[in-house]
Amino acid sequence: MFCIQCEQTIQTPAVKGCSFAQGMCGKTAEVSDLQDVLVYSLQGVSYWATQAHRYGIINDEINQWAPKAFFSTLTNVNFDPERILQLTSQAAQFKAQLKDQVLTASSLANSPLSEVPAVAEFELPENAQAILAFAPQVAVNRGKESVHEDVIGLRLLCLYGLKGAAAYMEHARVLEQTSNDIYAEYHEIMAWLGTDPEDLGELLDCSMRIGLMNYKVMEMLDHGETATFGHPVPTAVNVKPVKGKCILVSGHDLHDLEKILQQTEGKGINVYTNGEMLPAHGYPELNKYPHLVGNYGSAWQNQQKEFANFPGAIVMTSNCLLNPNVGQYADRLFTRSIVGWPGVAHIEGDDFSAVIESALAQPGFQHDEIEHMITVGFGRNALMNAAPAVIDQVKQGNIKHFFLVGGCDGDKAERSYYTDFTEAAPEDTLILTLACGKFRFNKNTFGDINGIPRLLDVGQCNDAYSAIQLALALAQEFDCGINELPLTLVLSWFEQKAIVILLTLFALGVKGIYTGPTAPAFLTPNLIAIIQEKFDMRSIGNVQDDLNTILAA
């Protein structure tokens, strides 16, 4: 195996990347190798989908399936080798189908194809053993013996960025938001990466193209969520348990949460959100259910302890999943969509009766704990409605600076930086936050500035789109560029969604972003230097030193 896509990958002076029997995330070498073959197969599918598009052939089923399958290889999503093999087999079938259609269309048009790349001609071996034997040939760092390490690094930046965008495409698709133009662009990029490009300039340009494409995807996802569930409104959420039977919903999928809420009505079951599902409470069409009683737990890395202590059924709708056998709760855990763990029950479709049965069989919480309320729901509409009041406070000198502090959380001790940063931020500053990094500080008290809360929870990781809209509105009001605003982004990364959001911000021209806790292992020192120079990206350091630098600018 060789996997270097997440922040927790092995990174020592001698070794970079997970290349032993098991990755740091818990996936086996077998699963990692099968995922490499799946990605290579999907690049072949994208080649033929791109050619098909040129002949006016658009296959909605394949367009919608391909990013979803790619999503299954994102960190902490699918650990089940059988499921990965099924996806790879499906990719081979779709590739053959598209190839036949393209060759027929090409013959009818008397326009033979130019040279077909190896990734498009690849034939999947007949059995799992043969597939695993083939896997080293399509490892994500293939060609490392003859290709400069900077080329490998930029290929991976593009691949992982596109993987993050594919995840958001799937989240949007679940809410019936699709775009043939975006699918076409996705396939073009995926197919091109399958040809193992070597030009550094083209690869860097490709990363920016991915960032801009993802901006459109986030816009599409924002529309899907708000059209379906209403615009988020500031809402108080209890983060302590209440007495009763219970179901915990983790991941990102609001559609699944809605179905669970509908199917548990009148059954005496309380529903809790976990992790990135916390922002669900701000959506009117979800918050209207009285048995959506609160949020349980914190960020993904704590789930083995928190899930073990949860006395009900648990549904994992997307990333991030950890080994459920550690806390011995695998028998009451259910996976959805592209999520998988060997031996864990998987739910197809929208019937959650098995989850409800499991919840009723568990003891549930035996008593109410004292309420602790936090506020969520400062999405795009709420932020834009508050913009005039915020602008007025800026003009009066009561708000001196804005910080966006958020992103993925993780285990490393260095991540305490983000807690310390928010606590040290002066009282005349506003802090926007999003994604699971917020759990480092979202239960703390920050007060307000003349009625405007100093901590504004914007939502999930994809709700970076909302923060961008506020920044654009402020820039327009003050007649300046985004980089001239008293606004600083302080981001934490862990996996590929965070990578593509960073690419989106770069592509939109946002500079001076602070990132941490460590640099991606797949980026060489030279590439990091290039990115720092081109985008003025900064690494987090000492909290007070960083604050002094930011506020003195």
From Swiss-Prot:
Top-tier EC class: oxidoreductase
Family indicated by similarity: Belongs to the HCP family.
Record's cofactor remark: Binds 1 [2Fe-2S] cluster. Binds 1 hybrid [4Fe-2O-2S] cluster.
Matching PANTHER family: HYDROXYLAMINE REDUCTASE
EC number: 1.7.99.1
Binding locations of hybrid [4Fe-2O-2S] cluster: 252, 276, 320, 408, 436, 461, 495, 497
InterPro entries assigned to the protein according to its UniProt record, in alphabetical order: HCP/CODH, Hydroxylam_reduct, Prismane-like_a/b-sand, Prismane-like_sf, Prismane_a-bundle
Source domain of life: Bacteria
Annotated compartments: Cytoplasm
Record PTM Cysteine persulfide, positions in chain: 408
Protein's UniProt name: Hydroxylamine reductase
Catalytic activity of the protein: A + NH4(+) + H2O = hydroxylamine + AH2 + H(+)
The UniProt record lists the keyword Glycosyltransferase: no
Organism of derivation: Vibrio vulnificus (strain YJ016)
Pfam families: Prismane
GO-annotated cellular components: cytoplasm
Reported cofactor(s): [2Fe-2S] cluster; hybrid [4Fe-2O-2S] cluster
Designated gene of the protein: hcp
Chain positions recorded as [2Fe-2S] cluster binding sites: 3, 6, 18, 25
GO biological process, one term: response to hydrogen peroxide
Function text: Catalyzes the reduction of hydroxylamine to form NH(3) and H(2)O.
Keywords: 2Fe-2S, Cytoplasm, Iron, Iron-sulfur, Metal-binding, Oxidoreductase
GO molecular function, one term: metal ion binding
